[in-house]
Swiss-Prot record:
Forms part of the ribosomal stalk which helps the ribosome interact with GTP-bound translation factors. Part of the ribosomal stalk of the 50S ribosomal subunit. Interacts with L10 and the large rRNA to form the base of the stalk. L10 forms an elongated spine to which L12 dimers bind in a sequential fashion forming a multimeric L10(L12)X complex. This is Large ribosomal subunit protein uL11. InterPro entries: Ribosomal_uL11 (IPR000911), Ribosomal_uL11_bac-typ (IPR006519), Ribosomal_uL11_C (IPR020783), Ribosomal_uL11_C_sf (IPR036769), Ribosomal_uL11_N (IPR020784), Ribosomal_uL11_N_sf (IPR036796). Keywords: Methylation, Ribonucleoprotein, Ribosomal protein, RNA-binding, rRNA-binding. GO terms for cellular component: cytosolic large ribosomal subunit. Gene3D superfamilies: Ribosomal protein L11, C-terminal domain, Ribosomal protein L11/L12, N-terminal domain. SUPFAM superfamilies: Ribosomal L11/L12e N-terminal domain (SSF54747), Ribosomal protein L11, C-terminal domain (SSF46906). HAMAP family: Ribosomal_uL11 (MF_00736). It comes from Desulfitobacterium hafniense (strain Y51). Belongs to the universal ribosomal protein uL11 family.
Amino acid sequence: MAKKVVGLVKLAINAGKANPAPPVGPALGQHGVNIMAFCKEYNERTKDQAGLIIPVEITVYEDRSFTFITKTPPASILLKKAANINSGSSEPNRKKVAQVSKTKVREIAETKMKDLNAASVEAAMSMVEGTARSMGITIVEG
């Protein structure tokens, strides 16, 4: 018989840096999950992606066991890394803060493909380009 799901927790945590402090502790503690077990497992799975924020979906079962799925980093984080900037523009329609090439956008779209609701890489690219536009990043050919 399948285990009964009692909770679904979604968090965005720095790769390899999960600890029992907020936001992880309180979110999992209210479901009775062993927080240290989650932190160790999450840090082990994400240690090679240091510096990125990795979203995670934790499914909590009736017997207090859990499983989790790590997603790809948000497009905005990948765009900031590609453009070497710390934050997007405060006024994206007026102030442009950086440029990213089409090839970089394609790489990001291919990375994000499994988490995006897109049928093709081109559709995923247009989603990433939209995120870039809303951050004040211009897309250049190349």
